[in-house]
Regions:
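Short, Lys/Arg-enriched N-terminal segments with co-localized hydrophobic residues
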Residues: 8-22
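Proline/glycine-rich low-complexity loops and linkers
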Residues: 153-195, 200, 286-359, 366-367
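Phosphate-binding and adjacent anionic-ligand microenvironments
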Residues: 270, 307-484
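N-terminal small/polar loop signature for handling phosphorylated ligands or for N-terminal nucleophile
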Residues: 62, 70-134, 226-284
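Gly/Ser/Thr-enriched, mixed-charge loops and adjacent short helices
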Residues: 35, 135-266, 484
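An N-terminal, well-structured beta->alpha segment
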Residues: 19-90, 94-95, 184-211, 417-421
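Gly/Ser/Thr-rich active-site loops/lids in small-molecule metabolic enzymes
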Residues: 146-148, 237, 289-308, 376-385
């Protein structure tokens, strides 16, 4: 089944699943993630550094360049981030690479610096919206894009002790010696230039606008306010006191209730909530309503269409976008594409087809003219741009998009592929599709990171959604796939 479907009109019989993306043993859809020193250990980080430092240096040597590999590193505010930073750096310099440290910063800033300053690759130490005791390693190529699967497969092979590359097997890769041992460079200036870049994208002054920012006690805590202050906003910040254990704790884009309350009680014009590494953004309008990634795609897609700037007349979404978004796009005469879940796949489609905007319901929004990955702070600037250009409140800009009720159930299973492909499950899904017709849709898909099958229905009422979700979930249970 293709990872992308492209549509113009509202649809009947939505494809039941996105393409099952090949997952590695360690790396999932968004890096190597797990509980610190449980699933993801300091030893893993050291070995990732060892491989990347050697591999990119070897690539350069084979192209006649004897200079060391240059690798840029950023991290979140988790307690374990320092441990992983030190062990990654140890591996990199032991293999002869130079490690450049942005210190606490956002994932999109690492992507920006990797691209602009021509690094061989970038590493972000982040578990995004996960709790503090988790962490992760995100790999970014020299173009500021998420790392290709071929390179990731080599990293995994090295972790498992069966690396084969450059025409031979490597039981161990060589250590650098003497003057070939790598250097460690403080590179906070790179983060500061990223802040300057964001400020330069401000089309309008935000003078007099009361903006609330929820930084999730994460990596945007000392970046977002600097940007909004420079553009003239009256900036108010919550959850910007990271202590190593409070990242995403009842804060940020996955716990947006606090920001909703703050906006209403303090008369804010708008609020923006980021996740731990600030690659996603959700908004709160002046009435306290949540503005999701789907709303953002609607608002900015419409804005670009009205200005004649929507190249290919297409907004790129994932299969998890709300049914109502496509109805709204039909009303506007905007085409849309649907990819597998993951901003990586949204970006790949955008690059291949020349699209300017795409993203996910969760708030990963990509503006391909300005960035190579989702960027939460950039997203908030673009929403501010539309508000200022149209001289409208955010609640007014969201009018025209009606969110369909949605029920999503995560079923923990013993074998997610077998459960999803089961003939009885497929028959139940087909029956639901036929009964919903063009009044809703069902989507059944495997999680990319957990032993979970997700069953989601969107329809005109929550009762209808629940009825059809239960129908499919019960078949999964009756056929013996539920774990524990």
């Amino acid at each position: 089944m293709s990872a992308v479907s492209r549509n113009r009109r509202c649809f009947s019989g939505e494809k039941q699943q996105d393409e099952v993306i090949k997952m590695g043993k360690y790396f999932g859809t968004d890096g190597f993630r797990g509980e610190a020193n449980e699933n993801l250990t300091a030893d893993h980080a050291y070995k990732v550094g060892r491989f990347l430092g050697w591999y990119y240096g070897e690539l350069k040597r084979r192209n006649g360049d004897d200079t060391p590999a240059r690798i840029i590193i950023g991290k979140e505010t988790r307690r374990s981030s320092y441990m992983f930073e030190y062990t990654l750096v140890g591996g990199l310099v032991a293999s002869g690479a130079d490690a450049y440290l942005l210190h606490v910063t956002t994932t999109p800033s690492v992507a920006y610096v990797a691209r602009v300053d021509e690094f061989d690759c970038g590493i972000m130490i982040s578990a995004s919206h996960n709790p503090y005791f988790d962490n992760g390693i995100k790999l970014i190529n020299g173009n500021g894009e998420k790392m290709d699967e071929e390179t990731i497969s080599l990293v995994e092979a090295y972790l498992d002790g069966n690396l084969e590359v450059f025409g031979q097997k490597w039981e161990e890769i060589p250590f650098a010696k003497k003057e070939k041992i790598g250097c460690t460079v403080d590179y906070v200036s790179g983060r500061n230039r990223y802040i300057g870049y964001l400020i330069s994208l401000g089309v309008y002054s935000f003078r007099g606008v009361k903006v609330a920012l929820d930084c999730a006690n994460g990596s945007s805590w000392n970046i977002a306010k600097a940007v909004f202050d420079a553009l003239g906003a009256k900036t108010y910040v919550i959850n910007a006191q990271p202590d190593g254990t409070n990242i995403n704790n009842n804060a940020g884009s996955t716990h947006i209730g606090g920001l909703q309350k703050y906006v209403v009680e303090n008369g804010m014009d708008v609020g923006f909530a980021y996740d731990g590494d600030a690659d996603r953004c959700l908004c709160v309008d002046e009435k306290g309503n949540v503005i999701t990634g789907d709303h953002i795609l609607y608002i900015y897609g419409k804005y670009m269409k009205e200005r004649g700037k929507l190249l290919t007349n297409t907004v790129v979404t994932t299969v998890m976008s709300n049914f109502g978004l496509y109805k709204a796009f039909d009303e506007l005469g905007i085409d849309y594409a649907k990819t597998a879940v993951g901003d990586k796949y949204v970006y790949e489609y955008m690059m291949k087809n020349g699209c300017r905007i795409g993203g996910e319901q969760s708030g990963h929004i990509i503006f391909s003219k300005y960035a190579s990955t989702g960027d939460g702070i950039l997203t908030s600037l673009k929403i501010m741009e539309v508000m200022m250009a149209r001289k409208k409140k955010l609640s007014e800009l969201a009018e025209g998009f009606t969110v369909y009720p949605q029920v999503l159930t995560n079923v923990r299973v013993t074998d997610k592929k077998a459960a999803q492909d089961d003939a009885d499950v497929q028959a139940a899904v087909k029956k639901v599709t036929e009964e919903l017709g063009d009044t809703g849709r069902i989507l059944v898909r495997e999680s990319g990171t957990e032993p979970v099958v997700r069953v989601m229905v969107e329809a005109e009422s929550e009762e209808v959604c629940q009825k059809y979700v239960d129908m499919v979930v019960n078949v999964i249970k009756e056929n013996g796939y539920v774990a524990g």
